[in-house]
Amino acid sequence: MARIANIDLGEFPLLLAPMEDVSDPPFRALCKQHGADLMYTEFISSEGLIRDAAKSVAKLDIFEYERPIGIQIFGAEIDSMREAAAICEEANPDIIDINYGCPVKKVACKGAGAGILQDIPKMVSMTAEIVKAVQKPVTVKTRLGWDDNTKYIVDVAERLQDVGIQAISIHGRTRKQMYKGEADWSLIAAVKNNPRMHIPVFGNGDVD
């Protein structure tokens, strides 16, 4: 039984991943009709939220029929992410999700999204600060590592759990792979089978 805080997702939950320019309200409504157990908004820039940018604020709109639903944020600065998480909480989502997986150059090369996989201590610190800043359950979406030499996801997942996240979604590729090659589900399984892990672990990549 998958459970995030007090949210019961059943035995084999299907999640709608947060996708920029895809996971908007009409698409979410369609996915909900077809059985999505948990959905997320498009990712939202932490800097955009704290600057009250219209495009970012508009993505906070969620509807009762969508529940349970999470709002996802991304950013490179701990203070901005902490403040953005608090803003998200005011929109009353069920979950606040942190994007540590976006591989796109304009995001990752600024240290946000998958870019933070090059600085695991910062990733852990940022997560801890966000968890402390909000009352809603915090989840994370990330990748196996930055490249083939840094696939530290088993250790990283455990460290993120230790600072308070309540679920983790893992894309079975590195940032260097982008969306090429095949997703490595064996490493996702290694996280799931780690006896020290007790939070839900969701797999992402090549799901069909």
How does the language model describe each region?
Residues 1-208:
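Flavin-dependent oxidoreductase catalytic cores
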